[in-house]
Amino acid sequence: MAKVLYITAHPHDEKTSYSMATGKAFIDSYKESNPNDEVVHIDLYKENIPHIDADVFSGWGKLQSGTGFEELSENEKAKVGRLNELSDQFAAADKYVFVTPLWNFSFPPVMKAYLDSVAVAGKSFKYTEQGPIGLLTDKKALHIQARGGYYSEGPAADMEMGHRYIGIMMNFFGVPSFDGLIVEGHNAEPNKAQQIKEDAIARAKEAGKSF
């Protein structure tokens, strides 16, 4: 039985969001094809995802110097403890499905905060004399992204930084399989928007059967 993290970063649901509609089609298809797998939905707009701030750095510093966890301040314990939970959960999973829109050439800031929370030495990667090495070498990941314009090719291709960033992080973590399911052009060509959405949902259903 595999454990799948279904990680969504959108304030809207599948009724108004192209990425969320595509994501729902994918994960429903996946569940149907893999009824024994465990799927955990992490809604980044509802979950507590601490930012790496002064409390976190202070707590980490104290722990590294030998201070016990219970001796940290209440804020330090809450934030550091939650970051530990998130990074442990991520390392223990087998598959990751990220769902985001393309906002200002990237993804919503809650996704950056989440990726920061799971980028932990000793869990998702480790430092060696030859440089950092990813530890998640038996995982696989998929990014479902909706883009109102066209960024797969053409003059805007170099401006897309959301899908590329997640790919860079998965590579850094050692994840050997990373794919994208991209929905694009629905704002650029509103007369084709419904067909674009239907095509994306159909692709998502097929992808969910074999992920």
UniProtKB/Swiss-Prot annotation:
Any coiled-coil regions, as ranges: none
Q: What is the name of this protein?
A: FMN-dependent NADH:quinone oxidoreductase
Top-rank taxon of the source lineage equals Bacteria
Matching Pfam families:
Flavodoxin_2
EC primary class: oxidoreductase
Q: Which UniProt keywords apply?
A: Flavoprotein, FMN, NAD, Oxidoreductase
Q: Per the UniProt record, which EC number(s) apply here?
A: 1.6.5.-, 1.7.1.17
Which residues of the sequence carry a binding annotation for FMN? 17-19
Q: Which reaction does it catalyse?
A: 2 a quinone + NADH + H(+) = 2 a 1,4-benzosemiquinone + NAD(+); N,N-dimethyl-1,4-phenylenediamine + anthranilate + 2 NAD(+) = 2-(4-dimethylaminophenyl)diazenylbenzoate + 2 NADH + 2 H(+)
The cofactor required is: FMN
Q: Per its database record, what is this protein's job?
A: Quinone reductase that provides resistance to thiol-specific stress caused by electrophilic quinones. Also exhibits azoreductase activity. Catalyzes the reductive cleavage of the azo bond in aromatic azo compounds to the corresponding amines.
- InterPro entries linked: Flavodoxin_fold (IPR003680), Flavoprotein-like_sf (IPR029039), FMN-dep_NADH:Q_OxRdtase_AzoR1 (IPR050104), NADH:quinone_OxRdtase_FMN_depd (IPR023048)
Subunit and partners: Homodimer.
Note how many cofactor molecules are bound and how. Answer: Binds 1 FMN per subunit.
Similarity-based family: Belongs to the azoreductase type 1 family.
- What HAMAP family does the database record attribute to this sequence? Azoreductase_type1
Q: Does the keyword Flavoprotein apply?
A: yes
Q: Which GO molecular function, any one, fits this protein according to its record?
A: electron transfer activity
What Gene3D superfamilies does the entry give? Answer: 3.40.50.360
Q: Does the keyword NAD apply?
A: yes
